[in-house]
Amino acid sequence: MSAVSLQDDEDTFKILIATDIHLGYLEKDAVRGNDTFVTFNEILEHAQKNEVDFILLGGDLFHENKPSRKTIHTCLESLRKYCMGDRPVSFEVLSDQAVNFQLSKFPWVNYQDENLNIFMPIFSIHGNHDDPTGVDALCALDILSCAGLLNHFGRSTSVEKIDISPILLRKGRTKIALYGLGAIPDERLYRMFVNKQVTMLRPKEDEDSWFNMFVIHQNRSKHGATNYIPEQFLDDFINLAVWGHEHECKITPAQNEQQHFYVTQPGSSVVTSLSPGEAVKKHIGLLRVKGKKMKMQRIALETVRTFYMEDVVLADHPELFNPDNPKVTQAIQAFCMEKVEMMLDNAERERLGNPRQPQKPLIILRVDYTGGFEPFIVHRFSQKYMDRVANPKDIIHFFRHREQKEKNDNDINFGKLLSRPASEEVTLRVEDLVKQYFQTAEKKVQLSLLTERRMGEAVQEFVDKEEKDAIEELVKFQLEKTQRFLKERHIDAEEEKIDEEVRKFRESRRKNTEEEDEEVREAMTRARAHRSEGVVLDSASSDEGLMDTGMKASGDSDDDIPTTLSRGRGRGRARGARGQNSAARGSSRRGRGNTSQGSSTSSRTYKSVPDKNSSIMDAFRSLKPEPSQSTSKFFSEDIIDDEMDLEESPISLSSKTNQRSSAMSSFSKRGSQSQMSRGVDFESDEDDPFKNTATSRRKK
C-alpha cells in the first residue's frame, strides 16, 4: 500500500479516542472543581484541530449517575461549541440504525438529523458511573443523545443474552465495524461469557474486509475469581479493542498473544484516586485506519493537574531513624517535609514548561512505618501546605507493610472454560442465592409475608439497577396489600387467626406467578414515583422554609393531645398565623421559643407518624403508613491497574482482502473462537502507510 499524506484522506478514518473523563468529579471543590471541564474542552479542541471524523468515548463521561445541573449545562455548552458547524461529514453509516440505536426515540446517527448541524459526531458507550438505572433504564448519556449532541450505543437490556450488533461505517474504500458494550457488573458478564450468552454479529458479505473495533468498559486486571473480563473472552476476529474503566494510561496498543488482536487502554483524563496508576502521564489517542492498517498517535494532555507520588520505607533508613530514639517522630516529620519539598520543586518546573497546567499540584507521600515506628499527626503537617497543593489533607499516607501469602494460582484455560457444554453452565445468580437462603433458613427467620421469589427479584433490582428503595418499597407494598386483605375478610384481632390468614394469603400468591410479577413491577414503579415525589417535596420545603415538621415538643402541655401529621401549606399558612391576635401568638407555655411563628414545636395538632417497622396488627389500630421518601446515593470506586507502559510505537495492520463498497445491514452469528487468517501484524517503518504523514506530537 502506498504512503498517504494528510491531504489524501478520502480512504483514511481519523478517530479521536478517549475514556473515563468523569465530568463533575469534585465539582464543589474550590481548587479542583473545574479540572474535568477544562480537560474535556482540551480533548474537544484536539479533535477539532486534527479534523477527526468522529470521537470515540469508552464510558464514564460523567462521574455521577445523576450529574448536577452545572455538570450537564457545562457539558452541553462544550458539545455545542466544538461539535456543531458546517464542515461536511465524510463517512457514511451502512448498518440498520434502527437496530444500532433501537432504545432511542431518534434511532439514527445525529449528524444525519435534518434539524441539526453536526460536523464532528461523538460515539460513546456508558460506563459504570453513568450507567442506565431506574424503571425507564435511562442515564445521563440519553439526555445528550436526545439533545442530538451524542450517539449512545452499546446498550443491552437483557440479562439472559446479549447480541452485539455493530455500527458499520465506510469512508472511501475503508470500512469499520464498530462494536460496543456498555458497563455490566463484571461477575454477571463473566458468567454470560462462560455460558455463551454473548454473541457478536458480523456482516454476511465480505466479513474479512472490515476493520473490527470493540469498545468495552470493564475490569481488565484481575480483582477476583470472576471480577474481571479476560481478554481471551473476546472474539478473535476483532482487530482493535478500546478498553475503558482502567485509569492507568496504556494507550499504545498491545497485542494479545493468544487472540492476536490489539488492545489500547487510554486511561482516565483526570486523577480520581491517589494511586500509582493515576500518576502515569495522561494521554488521548488519534487513531488512523486505512483498509486494515492502523496507526495510533499519542497526544499528551496539557491541562491535567500534575500528580507526584513517592513511597518511603522508614526501615530502609536505619542510619536516620531508630524507633528507640525519643525524637524519632520529629526526625521522620523533617524527612517527610524534605521529600514533599522536592516533589513540589519538580511540579513547579513542569508547570513552568506548560502554562496551561493548573498551578497547585497533587502530592502524596506514602510512608511505610513498619518496624516499630509511630506516625505523626498528619493534620498539623498538612496545614503547612494549604496554599501550595491541591490535596493538603492527603499529602501523607501512613501504612504498614503486610506480608501476603503466596497464592498458588494455576493459569486458567479460558478456551476450555468457554467450550464447556451447556450442562455445565454457571447458573449462580443473586436471586437464586436469596431463594436458597430463605428456603433452608430456620423457621424464625423465614419469610412470612413475601415469597422467596419476590424477595429475590427485589434484591436483583437493588443490585443490578441500583434501585435503593426496591426492597423497602416491595415490603411496604406487600404489607399494605396484606392489611387490605385482612380488613376485607373482617378477621378478629387475634394473633393466631391473623397468622393463619396471612399464611393462606401468602400461599395463594405464590401459586399465581403472573400476578407476582405484576406486583413487583408495580412496587418498583411506585418506588421511583415516591423518590421523585420526595425530591419535589424536599425542594418545596427548602424554598418555603416554613413547612410543618410533624414533631411534638417534649415540653408542651401535659394534656392528652392527639398527635396527627398534617402537611401545612408552607409560607401561606405561616402568613395566616400572623393575622391572629397577640395573645394567640404568645400563648405557648414555654414562652418566646415556642410561639407559633418562630418554632416548629407549636401547639398545633399533628397526626402521629407510623413506625416504619409496622406489623400486621397495625392494620387494626393505625392508619396506612406513608411511603418512604428517603433517597440515597451510590458511589463506585475504580480499581486502578498499577502497571506502567508509556512506550510509543506506530502500529499497522495488513490483510489480503477484497474491498467492496456495497451497503449491508444483515448479519450472521459466527463462532467467536474460529481460527482464520488474522492479517494483523506490526509493520516496519518502510511499510508504514503514514510514514510521510505530518503529525504534530505533543510534548510529554
Swiss-Prot record:
Compositional bias of kind Polar residues: 651-677
Q: Where are the compositionally biased (Acidic residues) regions?
A: 638-648
- Which Gene Ontology terms describe the biological processes this protein takes part in? DNA damage response; DNA strand resection involved in replication fork processing; double-strand break repair via homologous recombination; double-strand break repair via nonhomologous end joining; meiotic DNA double-strand break formation; mitochondrial double-strand break repair via homologous recombination; mitotic G2 DNA damage checkpoint signaling; mitotic intra-S DNA damage checkpoint signaling
Task: Please give the cofactor(s) recorded in the UniProt entry for this protein.
Answer: Mn(2+)
Q: Which Gene3D superfamilies does this chain map to?
A: 3.60.21.10, Mre11, capping domain (3.30.110.110)
Residue ranges under compositional bias (Low complexity)? 577-586, 593-604
Catalytic residue list: H129
Protein location: Nucleus; Chromosome; Chromosome, Telomere
Question: Where is Mn(2+) 2 annotated to bind?
Answer: D60, N128, H217, H245
The UniProt keyword set, sorted, is: Chromosome, DNA damage, DNA repair, Endonuclease, Exonuclease, Hydrolase, Manganese, Meiosis, Metal-binding, Nuclease, Nucleus, Telomere
Listed under subunit, the entry gives: Component of the MRN complex composed of two heterodimers RAD50 and MRE11 associated with a single NBN.
Q: Would you tell me the protein name for this molecule? A: Double-strand break repair protein MRE11
- Report which gene this protein is encoded by: MRE11
